[in-house]
């Protein structure tokens, strides 16, 4: 008998290859705005973006601030002119067109799991971007529902997004729920905050600093 009757998945870098999609979308955005997408420039953006996402996950800023500031800070850092808000909008549109899967086995694994458990997605991504990427990737063929933080009004690792997802799915016994994701800070900590078992998707065998322990 299966232990888990409900499995919640993160989206980016768990089911969908966000790194590949980001590389494509960022390159397309920089080229569109006349900025050379060399390694140093790309890393400058990523450093700014990652710091803002960490602040978001800690509840220090809201999503609107992240989207409104990341490209504005980037342009200021590289001393380039432009509208950061408009640049962010263009980037999100480009990102939504890249539904790359993490690997060729993703859909087969989801197909098998969907036969024994209810599957759903809990994502911190942007509503428009994630809805399109998930649909075009084929992932949604196996999902009961998808819960995206922008629409839900809270971000992982806040337990409220998991609470709302489980209510919508009609799940009461959390002993039979598993959260799967690549991020210790949002997925594993979030699942733990909600009283769920967790599985750290770690294909690159990164070291766990030990602060957040998956079950």
What label would you give each PLM region?
Residues 1-7, 20, 31, 107, ...:
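Asp-based, Mg2+/Mn2+-dependent phosphohydrolase catalytic module
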């Amino acid at each position: 008998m299966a232990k888990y009757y409900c499995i919640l998945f993160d989206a980016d870098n768990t089911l969908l290859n966000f790194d590949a999609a980001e590389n494509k979308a960022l390159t397309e955005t920089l080229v569109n705005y006349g900025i050379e997408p060399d390694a140093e420039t790309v890393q400058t953006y990523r450093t700014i973006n990652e710091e803002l996402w960490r602040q978001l996950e800690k509840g220090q800023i809201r999503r609107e601030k992240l989207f409104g500031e990341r490209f504005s800070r980037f342009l200021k850092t590289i001393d380039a002119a432009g509208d950061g808000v408009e640049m962010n909008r263009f980037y999100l549109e480009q990102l939504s067109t890249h539904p790359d899967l993490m690997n060729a086995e993703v859909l087969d694994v989801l197909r098998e799991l969907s036969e024994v458990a209810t599957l759903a997605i809990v994502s911190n991504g942007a509503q428009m971007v994630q809805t399109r990427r998930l649909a075009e990737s084929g992932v949604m063929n196996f999902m009961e529902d998808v819960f995206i933080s922008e629409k839900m009004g809270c971000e992982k690792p806040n337990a409220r997004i998991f609470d709302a997802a489980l209510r919508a799915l009609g799940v009461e016994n959390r002993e039979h729920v598993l959260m799967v994701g690549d991020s210790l800070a949002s997925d594993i900590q979030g699942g733990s905050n909600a009283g769920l078992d967790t599985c750290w998707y770690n294909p690159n065998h990164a070291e766990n600093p030990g602060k957040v322990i998956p079950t």
